[in-house]
Amino acid sequence: MMIPKELVKGSLKSIVLKLLAENKRMYGYEITQKVEELSEGKIKLTFGALYPILHKLESDGIVITEAEVINNRNRIYYMLTEKGNASAKERIRELEEFLQTIKILLNPQSGLENVFAKS
C-alpha cells in the first residue's frame, strides 16, 4: 500500500537530508530509487517533488553539487555542506520527535505508559 502524498510531503526534506548524510554523495535518480527501496515501494519520490527540494537546499547552502560525465551524460551529485550536516541532524531529530508525538496522539494510552515508564 502506497503512503498518501499528503503524509509524505512534509517529511521529504528530512528524508533527503538523512539519505545524503548516510551516503555522502548521491544523484537525483539514485535518491528516488533509494527512497522506494527503503520504503519497500510505499513511497515513490518523483523528480517533480525531489528537484525543488534539492534546489532549495542548494540555494540555502545546505548542499553543494558536483557534475560528473558518465557514459557521455552529465550527472549532478548532491553532497551536504558542514551546515547541511548540522541541518540534517536537527531535521532528523525534529522528525523523530514529531513521529513520537503522532504515535501518542493515535494511541494516547500507549503514550501515558511511555511517560510513566520514563519516571
Where are these regions (language model features)?
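Basic, amphipathic "hinge/linker" alpha-helix immediately C-terminal to the N-terminal HTH DNA-binding motif
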Residues: 70-92
